[in-house]
Swiss-Prot record:
UniProt cross-references to CDD domains, sorted A to Z: Maf
Chief localization: cytoplasm
Family: Belongs to the Maf family. YceF subfamily.
Intracellular or extracellular location(s): Cytoplasm
Entry protein name: 7-methyl-GTP pyrophosphatase
GO MF entry, a single one: nucleoside triphosphate diphosphatase activity
Residues at the catalytic site: 67 (proton acceptor)
Gene Ontology biological process terms, A to Z: nucleotide metabolic process
NCBIfam families hit by this protein: maf
Single GO cellular component term: cytoplasm
UniProt site positions, description: Important for substrate specificity: 11, 68, 152
Cofactor: a divalent metal cation
Amino acid sequence: MKLILASTSPYRKNILEKLCIPFSCASPSADETPMNNESANTLVARLAAEKALSVGVTQKGLIIGSDQVACVDGVILGKPGNKLKAFDQLTQLSGKTVTFFTGLSLLDSKTQRQETIVETFDVIFKSLSAKQISRYLELEEPYDCAGSFKSEGLGIALFSSLDGRDPNTLIGLPLIALVAMLKKFEIDVFEHMQ
């Protein structure tokens, strides 16, 4: 089995390493601009599938594509990119429930069989002061993360509760769903753990 993660994200790579199965990483190409009136669910499913397909053009094997966005009050939040936007995002999220949509796609590039699913995960934020938000951003600099936080780091202090079936989903790669998808492709991860 040749498993390829269609991602340059160090977070997704770290998550997949938890399974102790061999894999490589490849840089995908996909236009991440949402289409007109595209829902968060549809957007992440489309992008996860496109990322896997883009890598499948040049590489053979089972290719994992993934994409994630956060949604609050019906608005899709992407990666902030800088401190000012991150501050604005966290101010907007303060005291609210945020739903994270994570698209996961598995492509067999030899047969072109592809399955795509979307996992959701809810995060309930504490009411945060401007001082708390500024201090958090000073310490963690989560500018490359949807929602402007790292739940696997200091970001956990921003939340009052979490609700979802797999905490890895929140970081960007739903492992429980991935193991089930691999099984559908007749891959038992236990046989490949090293």
